[in-house]
């Protein structure tokens, strides 16, 4: 094990295509642009409905052009540019209609407000022959890449158990629009973990789920969620989120854990703890050895979910465009499968549990 190589970074494209931004809100400010700067990607232009914000972002991040209309951006966009769309889910269809056919687009998740809208988005992308991916960037967080590296090398054997547990305090007041979103926690947070589970475990046959409100945020349609994925009688997969643990850092938890026939991996997601300051990530793995007590090994992870994962989601699209990979991992078609699981979780929560007789 001393010579074990654990990959942590996403593979970059050979060619760096210019990027143009549609929408420059908090996620772009805090993650997209820091990631692109770190990778060496160039943002050629941007547009936001808030003109003042757009020009401020252009000045801060040395973007050469801030356009006052989407139409103006489209006309002036280089022919080989990637459209980086970070707008509310309800606005995705309207934006895609205005993007020229046969162009490359990276769309901020979720893929619409619901499964039906997701299907409309996929149909439009196919009609316009867009090379379209969804920014499910958690797949490319350094600790996730490290876990996949170990699993693909067979280090922990066959994975039969995957668990995501989040017990943190999330200041939902930072995103007031979520008060208007049905099943907000599932659609805007647990969707990360649903997509991650699919990426590692494949397609579940069904879902058991319940999302509940919390007395502190009754206006929000769900802030704590339990999801059980049905992968048959041998694999256990679940997601548990409690965003209202307001009792200090001591008992906060935020991790992804994989257990296999030969070992296990546990990755701490420090970003979500003590939010928005965060805590350091941590990565450990254990490999069983005959006749020996289990030993957990610690790996120093370089980089974090925000912003480093956003390098990976953009890189995978660029690599597909340049032809260095044959499959687009987070294509809109694949993302629609994640939306189908999200929809099933919402339906399960609404449908309720099996009633107890007596």
Predicted regions and their residues:
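C-terminal helix-rich "cap/oligomerization" subdomain common to oxidoreductases
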Residues: 1-15, 81-85, 316-358
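N-terminal Rossmann-like dinucleotide-binding module
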Residues: 2-61
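Contiguous beta-strand/loop segments that form the cofactor/metal-binding neighborhood of enzyme cores
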Residues: 2-5, 188, 194-276, 311-325, ...
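Active-site loop of classical SDR/Rossmann-like NAD(P)-dependent oxidoreductases
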Residues: 27, 302-315
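Beta-loop-alpha module in the N-terminal Rossmann-like domain of NAD(P)-dependent dehydrogenases
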Residues: 65-124
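Hydrophobic residues in well-ordered beta-strands that form the structural core
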Residues: 107-108, 132-134, 163, 239, ...
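Rossmann-fold dehydrogenase core element
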Residues: 120-138, 157-164
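Predominantly a Rossmann-like dinucleotide-binding segment in NAD(P)-dependent oxidoreductases
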Residues: 138-219, 225-226, 352
